[in-house]
Regions:
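Basic, polyanion-binding surface patches
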Residues: 1-38, 42-140
């Protein structure tokens, strides 16, 4: 998915699921409507390994909706990273992981630096400002 607004809406819960997902033609499995491609899989196994989950899947349907891939710049992945860091703020704060929490805020600010220095896209700049603003509210 090359649409940051999808990630923003999911993380900040600012939209309904209406229009965000669509069903495939072959299986009643939803996928993100704006995805360039998607793979539908059958879950073969799911296990916890060292505090992480390991899923083994078998592809059952591959759909390519856009034949020409979109190009990326550093801003897009930096915003996605910032969203991931943002989702860790509450758990780190709750668990009183002070050192990790401080590092998390530093990483968020680094993501902001990357976005500001790699794009002039107004939408991307607004997204990173929103993430930082919300993060600082959580810190307070």
């Amino acid at each position: 998915v090359y649409n940051i607004s999808v990630f923003m809406k999911c993380v900040f819960k600012t939209c309904s699921n209406e229009g965000l997902y669509e069903l495939s033609n072959k299986f009643p499995i939803p996928h993100i409507a704006s995805a360039d491609a998607y793979i539908e899989c059958k879950l073969l196994s799911l296990e916890e390994v060292n505090g992480k989950f390991k899923a083994v899947c078998k592809p059952i349907n591959v759909v390519i909706k856009r034949s020409t891939p979109r190009t990326f710049n550093r801003a897009f992945p930096a915003i996605i990273e910032a969203l991931i860091y943002y989702t860790k703020i509450k758990p780190f704060k709750k668990l009183k992981l002070e050192k990790e929490f401080k590092k998390l805020i530093e990483r968020l600010m680094h993501c902001k630096y990357i976005v500001e220095h790699s794009t002039s896209n107004k939408e991307y700049l607004e997204y990173i400002e929103k993430i930082i603003s919300e993060a600082l509210k959580e810190v307070g």
